[in-house]
Amino acid sequence: MPKRILEGVVVSDKGDKTVVVKVERTFLHPVLKKTVRRSKKYHAHDEANTYKVGEVARIIECAPKSKLKTWEVLPKGGAAQA
């Protein structure tokens, strides 16, 4: 199965080699037929501490690195594709 790639905004860079990325998704409510926005925060591994709060980051699934981190940030510029 291919690894998922998500895009979101960095909301925290306080941890060493860790960023928290908020990913927002939209869907149509089945009863109200209205577009609903939902967001989820993912802890992602940032080896070089390159991302800062407010920047848009792309994250990819990986093997678990810690209790909360199962995602890695892709390098800036989009050079690396999985």
From Swiss-Prot:
It comes from the Bacteria. GO terms for biological process: translation. Keywords: Ribonucleoprotein, Ribosomal protein, RNA-binding, rRNA-binding. SUPFAM superfamilies: Nucleic acid-binding proteins (SSF50249). NCBIfam families: PRK05610.1 (NF004123), uS17_bact (TIGR03635). Belongs to the universal ribosomal protein uS17 family. One of the primary rRNA binding proteins, it binds specifically to the 5'-end of 16S ribosomal RNA. This is Small ribosomal subunit protein uS17. It comes from Phenylobacterium zucineum (strain HLK1). The gene is rpsQ.
